[in-house]
Amino acid sequence: MPTVGIKKVILDKHFKRVYSEKEFDELCFEYGLELDEITSEKAAVEKEQGTRAASDLNDQEVYKIDIPANRYDLLSVEGLARAIRIFKQEIPSPAYKYADVPKTGLQKIIVKKETAQVRPFVVGAVLRDISFDADSYASFIDLQDKLHQNICRKRTLVAIGTHDLDTIQGPFEYRAEAPKDIKFKPLNQTKEYTAEELMTLYSTDSHLKAYLPIIQNHPVYPVIYDKNGVVCSMPPIINGEHSKITLNTKNVFIEATATDKQKAFVVLDTIVTLFSQYCAKPFTIEQVEVVYEETGVKELYPLLSYREMTVTTPEINTKIGINLKDEEMATLLNKMSLKAEVAAKETLKIVVPPTRHDILHACDIAEDVGVAFGYNNLITKLPESNTVAVAFPINKLCDNLRIEIAAAGWTEALNFALCSRDDISSKLRQPDALSHAVHIGNPKTLEFQVARTSLLPGLLKTLSSNRDMPLPLKLFELQDVIVKDSNTDVGARNERRLAAVYYNRAAGFEIIQGFLDRIMRMLNVNPARDGTGYYIEADENSTYFPGRCAKIIGPKGVVLGHIGALHPEVITSFGLTLPCGAVEINVEPFL
């Protein structure tokens, strides 16, 4: 969930009144938002970078507001204040419209076929006669950053470029060229660089280096030229210095290149609808014509589509648990920046503006009705039918086991279900384990790459983090592991396991075996080799020390797991220095 930080004085300016902290907190709650924190620029920088870095900043209050991830129209103070003022019925919903076609015609972007290799789509728009001040200019830049981090998925799906139209001339060309053939002066630089040189230059830039891999391995890079061959931008990396916008910019040319065309529509609509309020003719946007040279297809942007939806009031009432009349529900929806009217008895026709791309289904309409009605006004009542909850047998069994194990002097550990690839393979001396593991498609950290196939890595990490505690350390965990299974509909299944480790100056095999005996006694399983009880049998497992490992065989000859002294390489790979005994069994056969 993105967080927007806005100075209180700017909020007051846009709301045209002063809210107290309590009033604004309640107002946010009414609209389905949350005032996360009240801080200041100085306090925020002091917290992250220290007192010296914050010495030149001011102490003006900054309200940090949590915004739903799909409400891109609330990512700037312009959209937030407008939406809440409409909600408070202080202003009507604006009507977004296209500007008249200039005498010189619409601006054009001609798309060359080579762009299909790297970023095939582009959209554009023009904001004419716009007036920026310091606050609105900063908000304009900040909105682009917020969009890049959210819907644009860090510029992989969409990259936004904004330019001073008075410094460049159309028609524009969107090309894809070899890096050595692209040369221009990038934003905030004093000399020209080739695209190859820029990749080296920005490889150490804390902000831009994250975007380099998006195009770095492509044979061609995307680039936008104006009529005179001036480079406007090299998306998704950097804009050109020549066309950068300033406080004095009067006409803004907006382009957005994309790998996802739908996301580009949404991004462009969001920017122009929020900032067209600063144009001489508010909420008026000039279109840009995009021409695909290879196919001859011509498209006009932005779309500014007003979509129509039809819902029935009984359906919405049932979802929320209220009983509103048609007219009452229409009034509530109008407060949420929608245009609703009664089309027929128990039927509403709703017009969704281009700011509300989050409205996709009748459920979204129901959510807006709930917000406008007020969640605090919903009456809680008991359902007409009773359903009595019953614990799953496996959970009931595990809860009983936990109580008994803790009573025996063992401490329970709770570890993450995800771990690194090394944790379940090389560190456990199990090179084949990765073929049985469920892998995360796009892991954010090295610690969360696969779903665990064993409980031992988590317990050994816990030991490593607590090795300064008094010995012995006796830990257990009773949780799920995830293993591949082609017989299930998703190709994997959960398996409930119990694992324990004993860490001391001696491996304490007798301690860990005593733990196993106690567990079996609690499960009413006696030592026996006739298929009715359990027994251990010497076995080889590379995780354990040779000659000090056994497999545990349960009723009906089912192999439950292994017990033994861990191999020294396993112990040292987790940062431990003393011997360690371990046991891990599957508890599901005991159901």
Swiss-Prot record:
Alphabetical UniProt keywords: Aminoacyl-tRNA synthetase, ATP-binding, Cytoplasm, Ligase, Magnesium, Metal-binding, Nucleotide-binding, Protein biosynthesis
Superkingdom, taxonomy of origin: Eukaryota
Domain B5: 304-380
Cited SUPFAM superfamilies: Class II aaRS and biotin synthetases (SSF55681), PheT/TilS domain (SSF56037), Putative DNA-binding domain (SSF46955)
Major site of localization recorded for this protein: cytoplasm
GO cellular component: phenylalanine-tRNA ligase complex
Reactions accelerated catalytically: tRNA(Phe) + L-phenylalanine + ATP = L-phenylalanyl-tRNA(Phe) + AMP + diphosphate + H(+)
Cofactor: Mg(2+)
Any one of the GO BP annotations: phenylalanyl-tRNA aminoacylation
Cross-referenced SMART domains: B3_4, B5
PROSITE patterns linked: B5 (PS51483)
Annotated signal peptide: none
Subunit structure: Tetramer of two alpha and two beta subunits.
Similarity section: Belongs to the phenylalanyl-tRNA synthetase beta subunit family. Type 2 subfamily.
Protein name: Phenylalanine--tRNA ligase beta subunit
Species this protein is from: Caenorhabditis elegans
